[in-house]
Curated annotation (Swiss-Prot):
Disulfide bonds: none annotated. This is DNA-directed RNA polymerase subunit omega. Its EC number is 2.7.7.6. Gene3D superfamilies: 3.90.940.10. The keyword Membrane does not apply. Belongs to the RNA polymerase subunit omega family. Residues 69-90 are annotated as: Disordered. Coiled coil: none annotated. Pfam families: RNA_pol_Rpb6. The keyword Nucleotidyltransferase applies.
Length: 90
């Protein structure tokens, strides 16, 4: 397992504050959201996996934002379809 350095990951994100936000969002996705890792897990914890993904350029703030927007739109569409089917059945 290659060691992840903060400096390498900060260079990919821009600053250490955004790094904390992006890496924690991604780690939470990996741990609770049922998202698959984009790098081999190698028995690492979600936080380390998130940092490795950032270091390799696989995860960015814009990518996370786009994925969350897409998931929200899909959820909204499913809810709208469910409500429509209920109102049409009356």
């Amino acid at each position: 397992m290659a060691r992840v350095t903060v400096q390498d990951t900060v260079e990919k994100i821009g600053n250490r504050f955004d790094l904390v936000l992006v890496s924690s969002r991604r780690a939470r996705q990996l741990q609770t959201g049922g998202k698959d890792a984009l790098v081999p897990e190698e028995n690492d914890k979600p936080t380390v996996i998130a940092l490795r993904e950032i270091e390799e350029g696989l995860i960015t703030k814009d990518l996370l934002d786009a994925r969350e927007r897409q998931e929200q739109q899909e959820q909204d569409a499913a809810e709208l379809a469910a409500v429509s089917s209920i109102t049409h059945n009356r």
